[in-house]
Amino acid sequence: MKKASSIRREVFFTIGKNVINAEGFKKLDEVAAYMKECPEATVTVTGYADRGTGSAKINDRIAARRADIVEAELIKRGVARDRIIKSSKGSRVQPFSDNDMNRVTICIAEDKI
């Protein structure tokens, strides 16, 4: 059976928080498992914050912290730091039309082969 060439997982957060819930940990386990199966893969971790709350400065800080936390959890699960590309968009970019869903860190892992 051919493995997927990429996976995408969203880790959602409560407003103003950077604590990962049980569902988020499950998604990070899936990303880590994919990374172990695909040793040439890299994972892009991008943190976001919703536009509906906080100032741009606060949202930048929250989104960056969310990306940091997700990166740390992937490293704990055996993903090498040099295989993780991390960024944050604050509230400048909104990946979802539903404001509440933009309290998220999106992980996209792609195999290079």
Model features per residue range: what roles?
Residues 1-42, 82, 96, 100-113:
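Periplasmic peptidoglycan-binding/tethering modules of Gram-negative envelope proteins
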Residues 45:
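Conserved phosphate/oxyanion-binding catalytic-loop motifs
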Residues 25, 48-113:
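Periplasmic OmpA-like peptidoglycan-binding domain that tethers envelope proteins to the cell wall
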